[in-house]
Design a protein with these regions (language model features):
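N-terminal pre-Walker A segment at the start of P-loop NTPase domains
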Residues: 1-16
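ABC ATPase nucleotide-binding domain "signature" loop
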Residues: 30-33, 307-313, 342
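Phosphate-binding P-loop
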Residues: 17-23, 295-298
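Phosphate-binding glycine-rich loops of NTP-binding sites
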Residues: 24-61, 287-288, 336-339
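Conserved ABC ATPase signature
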Residues: 234-295, 302-318
Length: 406
């Protein structure tokens, strides 16, 4: 399975400069304001970029100036490189190729591409770089690879070319395979369980291609699974029953008044009464969304979940962590958490600590050394072995051994 194994990011929001490897499971911890949300926001931007909606995302994010590290007076571009390899903590980060972009602000507060490059393996086994438009060539020498060449693109375009790019026939398969790895990166956020949340409303029956980021089409998606993927549906139902024993089953059907509509309904043991989504607790409703996401048959290549522990009982967190581990054999997961109990369910290699580092250097008019930034740290079992003989990961977090405390 191809995973996003290595990422370099510069100039994005609180992230001045980041270079880090990623594994099958990545659990981000850190205090409020450290930069977890900004890291997740980068993937939101990437997803919108690949979908052809970069400028809309920039506008909704407050403009280019708000997206650059301390604004355009300090930072003149956002630079990112993403590389793909085999899953696991021991891997060749560059094995399958990569994707590189540089975005710079315009006078009207938009972002435009300075460059956009797909890195791919040439049939001769060297890793080549293919620009997405014709132009001059120049040599590149990344540390991880040899014999690199770059076909530089023209620059100046406002939306990504990778999704619709058609390379030369001789290179088609190699480049197409890398282009297919670039997204989608969907951030799932099941926080809204208010009375007006989409998850509680009647929705379109046929809106079932994928589970929406807010689980707004949960009823339609579950109905599709019931009809086409009964095994996965039963896994979801079983998971819900483990944390909500009186739950018998979902009672999913097209609306009698409009056969193109559907609403989330359910039943409990010993009764034929149909309950609605408003009669589920917030935590139970979120858990149903999470179970559906992680137990579906066709997982997105990379899943990002923001604070999945909200409203869940400790026993539900254990079950959720088990589903995360199971899903990690078919997809890559990036999670943020503030829960000590949830953190205890994972391995040291899964943990990434994010902290805010404020420089002690004075900030002057001609220097930016005094500005703060988000700093990322990975952990491993070897360095924590002695600690883990006596303490859990959660306790080490509370003791600030892992960092990530206010």
């Amino acid at each position: 399975m191809a995973e996003l194994t290595h990422i370099t990011l510069k100039g994005f929001k609180s992230i001045k400069e980041l270079e880090i490897g990623l594994g099958p499971i990545n659990v981000l911890i850190g205090p409020n304001g450290a930069g977890k949300s900004n890291f997740i926001s980068f993937f939101r931007m990437l997803n919108e970029l690949i979908e052809g909606h970069l400028q809309l995302f920039v506008a909704r994010s407050g403009g280019a100036n708000a997206m650059l590290h301390y604004g355009t007076k300090v930072t003149n571009s956002i630079d990112a490189e993403l590389y793909f390899g085999r899953g696991g903590h021991e891997h060749d980060s560059y094995e399958y190729g990569g994707y590189q972009i540089q975005l710079t602000p315009t006078e009207d507060d938009k972002l435009v591409f300075v460059k956009e490059i797909l890195h791919f393996k040439h049939p001769t086994e060297s890793l080549d770089n293919e620009g997405l438009e014709s132009g001059h060539k120049k040599a590149l020498t990344p540390e991880e690879c040899k014999n690199l060449s770059e076909e530089a693109m023209g620059g100046g375009h406002t939306e990504a070319l990778a999704p619709r790019w058609r390379p030369e026939e001789s290179m088609f398969d190699e480049i197409k395979n890398v282009a297919a790895m670039v997204g989608p990166w969907i951030v799932y956020h099941f926080h809204d369980t208010s009375s007006t949340a989409r998850i509680k409303q009647t929705g379109d029956l046929h809106e079932n291609d994928r589970l929406e980021p807010d689980a707004g089409n949960l009823a339609a998606f579950l109905y599709m699974l019931h009809e086409r993927h009964s095994r996965n549906y039963e896994l979801i139902r079983s998971a819900v029953r483990r944390i909500f024993p009186r739950f018998k089953d979902f009672a999913l059907r097209p609306s009698p008044l409009n056969l193109d509509k559907i609403r989330l309904e359910w039943q409990e043991h010993g009764s034929d009464y149909r309950f609605g989504p408003h009669q589920l607790s917030d935590g139970t409703l979120r858990f149903i969304g999470l179970a559906t996401l992680l137990l579906q048959p066709n997982l997105p290549s990379t899943i990002l979940i923001d604070e999945p522990e909200l409203g869940l009982h400790p026993s539900a967190l254990t079950l959720l962590a088990g589903m995360v581990r199971s899903a990690s054999s078919r997809a890559q997961l990036i999670l943020t958490t503030q829960s000590v109990s949830f953190l205890n369910e994972f391995e040291p290699e899964d943990i990434i600590t994010i902290e805010r580092r404020d420089s002690t250097a004075p900030l002057t008019s001609d220097s930016h050394d005094g500005l703060g930034e988000s700093v990322f740290s990975k952990h491993d079992g070897k360095s924590l072995k002695e600690w883990l003989n006596a303490y859990s990961l959660g306790e080490l977090w509370e003791m600030n051994v892992l960092g990530g405390r206010p």
